[in-house]
């Protein structure tokens, strides 16, 4: 089984378990928080991801941590399963797929907007309203910064890329100029 299928299977299984108790959003918040804790702590990440650390030691440490947290039993069991199967390294990918499943179930499109600098709240709202009007769909926007686009914005959703950047425009002009033949 390839990595993408494995990630998809774990995310779908977690989502379906959350769906049974109608706690999809709560589980999403908890696994996102858990993933942030792991990603932000070098020591925890090193411990969980290291093949040199015995699985039993990882499980024992995890079980002692569970007693001090208020995470849902589904989240605790899920992370325990990842530890037992040596799959903790794909947790961030699982969180990403889980989020997509959650948005799809709520009929919300995920849209990534890339700009050269941080957009003001009014600009973000304007972009969101324009995109929602065009797609006739509710959206959840994620804003990223990329200085290489020089100016403008790039919008990504589903398999669609809308490039309104200066870099994209220059690349289009360059492509057209390559096709021009001088007599």
Swiss-Prot record:
GO terms for molecular function: proton-transporting ATP synthase activity, rotational mechanism. It is a peripheral membrane protein. It holds the Pfam family OSCP. One of its GO terms (cellular component) is plasma membrane. It comes from the Bacteria. InterPro entries: ATP_synth_OSCP/delta_N_sf, ATPase_OSCP/dsu. It is found in: Cell inner membrane. The keyword Cell membrane applies. Keywords: ATP synthesis, Cell inner membrane, Cell membrane, CF(1), Hydrogen ion transport, Ion transport, Membrane, Transport. Belongs to the ATPase delta chain family. F(1)F(0) ATP synthase produces ATP from ADP in the presence of a proton or sodium gradient. F-type ATPases consist of two structural domains, F(1) containing the extramembraneous catalytic core and F(0) containing the membrane proton channel, linked together by a central stalk and a peripheral stalk. During catalysis, ATP synthesis in the catalytic domain of F(1) is coupled via a rotary mechanism of the central stalk subunits to proton translocation. This protein is part of the stalk that links CF(0) to CF(1). It either transmits conformational changes from CF(0) to CF(1) or is implicated in proton conduction. F-type ATPases have 2 components, F(1) - the catalytic core - and F(0) - the membrane proton channel. F(1) has five subunits: alpha(3), beta(3), gamma(1), delta(1), epsilon(1). F(0) has three main subunits: a(1), b(2) and c(10-14). The alpha and beta chains form an alternating ring which encloses part of the gamma chain. F(1) is attached to F(0) by a central stalk formed by the gamma and epsilon chains, while a peripheral stalk is formed by the delta and b chains. NCBIfam families: ATP_synt_delta (TIGR01145). This is ATP synthase subunit delta.
């Amino acid at each position: 089984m390839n990595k993408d299928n494995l990630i998809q299977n774990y995310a779908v299984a977690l989502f379906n378990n959350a769906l049974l108790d109608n706690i999809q959003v709560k589980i999403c918040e908890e696994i996102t928080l858990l993933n942030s804790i792991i990603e932000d702590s070098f020591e925890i990440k090193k411990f969980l991801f290291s093949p040199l650390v015995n699985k039993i030691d990882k499980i024992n440490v995890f079980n002692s941590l569970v007693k001090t947290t208020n995470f849902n039993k589904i989240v605790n069991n899920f992370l325990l399963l990842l530890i037992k199967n040596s799959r903790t390294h794909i947790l961030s990918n699982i969180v990403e797929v889980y989020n997509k499943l959650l948005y799809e179930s709520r009929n919300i499109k995920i849209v990534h907007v890339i700009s050269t600098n941080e957009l003001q709240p009014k600009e973000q709202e304007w972009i969101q309203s324009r995109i929602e009007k065009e797609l006739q769909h509710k959206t959840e926007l994620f804003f990223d910064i990329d200085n290489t686009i020089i100016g403008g914005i790039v919008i990504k959703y589903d398999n669609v890329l809308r490039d309104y950047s200066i870099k994209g425009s220059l690349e289009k002009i360059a492509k057209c100029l390559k096709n021009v033949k001088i007599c």
